[in-house]
Amino acid sequence: MIEVIISAMRLVAQDIISLEFVRADGGLLPPVEAGAHVDVHLPGGLIRQYSLWNQPGAQSHYCIGVLKDPASRGGSKAVHENLRVGMRVQISEPRNLFPLEEGVERSLLFAGGIGITPILCMAQELAAREQDFELHYCARSTDRAAFVEWLKVCDFADHVRFHFDNGPDQQKLNAAALLAAEAEGTHLYVCGPGGFMGHVLDTAKEQGWADNRLHREYFAAAPNVSADDGSFEVRIHSTGQVLQVPADQTVSQVLDAAGIIVPVSCEQGICGTCITRVVDGEPDHRDFFLTDAEKAKNDQFTPCCSRAKSACLVLDL
């Protein structure tokens, strides 16, 4: 863990604030990587993940952006209402689950709303490398889009395209046309609300884009509860202990109650922290972290949100 001080906070769009962290001991932070995020420990014991958006390679400070979301489980509310300049908070070292691919001919970046934060960091990295890219930034309106004025005058402004729901029709996003015009060497990166990401990714797949060219990061998972959810068992491979997982509890909650600790963070199947190997049984994958190919192997799952299709899952614990 790293203790940091909030050195600056500013409103960058309606309901979006940017926070700047500096190391409390005055030292250097691990360098920023494009696509990386940090875990921020918030008041009330909450831990939330926020992408870094400042210049890749920076070590003097970190910058994150936080949307105050009415559907929040408490994290964004805690940031907006409880954090203030000068306060000390604990953060993790950066982790990168959304990196830029090496050796790519061209990159197509799609950001929806607050999803601009990791995408902005990627754009800065690609511009510094002098690599070919295009950034498409979508938002409901200009006042709800962060960093717009800066993007209009930055060094790579000619690579940026804006798409606002309340703008003229000719500037609205036409994902099908954009994706159809790209060569096979182009890779796609997308971050934003689930519906936005689903539209971009589904359009790409319909046009034959290979999965290894599609890169995504989810900020929040849509509710994934089924009325047909039932109970099932998990068996601990090392001890043979059998635990019942009721319909209204997750595997990680049941394991925790039994004193079996599996690290969790997002609790929504987004971050990959809790991935656990499956020895036997068939998981019901409900996460947004594993790829379709990884899910098809059924040899790992996310106990924070995924369940079981079989009567029992044997876990490598």
Swiss-Prot record:
Pathway named in the protein's UniProt entry: Xenobiotic degradation; vanillyl-alcohol degradation
Enzyme class: oxidoreductase
Enzyme Commission number(s) from the entry: 1.14.13.-
Positions annotated to bind [2Fe-2S] cluster: C266, C271, C274, C304
PROSITE patterns in UniProt: 2FE2S_FER_1, 2FE2S_FER_2, FAD_FR
Gene Ontology terms describing biological process: lignin catabolic process
GO terms for MF: 2 iron, 2 sulfur cluster binding; metal ion binding; oxidoreductase activity
Name listed for the protein in its UniProt record: Vanillate O-demethylase oxidoreductase
Cofactor(s) this protein requires: FMN
Organism: Pseudomonas sp. (strain HR199 / DSM 7063)
